[in-house]
Amino acid sequence: TMEDKKLPEKVILMYDAVIGMLEDGIDLNQMKVIDITKRAGIGKGTAYEYVSSKEELIVGALLYDIQKQFERIIGVITATDGFQSKVERILDWILDNFRECKTFALFARIGMGTYDISEHLQNEMRKAHTKECCVTNTLEQVVDEILECGVKEGILKPVKKELQRMAFGSQILI
């Protein structure tokens, strides 16, 4: 988990500031380091002790927030038995936490190319994507657990995991 990495408190403050700005409707492309650090209650120069660019900070914040959400949903899924119950719990969780799912939806839109971002931000997203992305692994883990449950119960056919993931994801995100 991301908490295992023990992020410095000031990094968490900056990440929370970015997420708060997103929740307030501020576009990623309009965010400035000075506004992020002011909201986080730290000096602008402090940001550059931890990150090399605004884009690295924004992408880090998105990944951090998504990882937190996934850790919560994994808790919900693993505490639930049965395919139908797991799917219902996910849908309930999404409805109950819709505001908090904003980052995930934004991240998905960026990944699918339906949200315009600056070239610098695109480059940072690519860098984050090429690293072993724990967010993707966590999402696959959650989806695979649900799908395996569906196969065991005879609700789903045992087909390629990639196809199952795509079909499941498209139905949940629609």
Which residues does each predicted region cover?
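Basic, helix-initiating cap at the start of DNA-binding domains
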Residues: 1-39, 56
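Short, basic, alpha-helical segments at the C-terminal edge of helix-turn-helix-like DNA-binding modules
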Residues: 33, 63-70
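Short hydrophobic/aromatic patch on the recognition helix
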Residues: 41-51
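Short amphipathic alpha-helical segment with a characteristic S/N-K-E followed by hydrophobic residues
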Residues: 53-58, 68-69
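Hydrophobic alpha-helical connector segments
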Residues: 60, 74-103, 168
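Amphipathic alpha-helical packing segments from all-alpha helical-bundle domains
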Residues: 74-75, 115-153, 166
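Hydrophobic alpha-helical segments that form the core
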Residues: 96, 140-149, 157-174
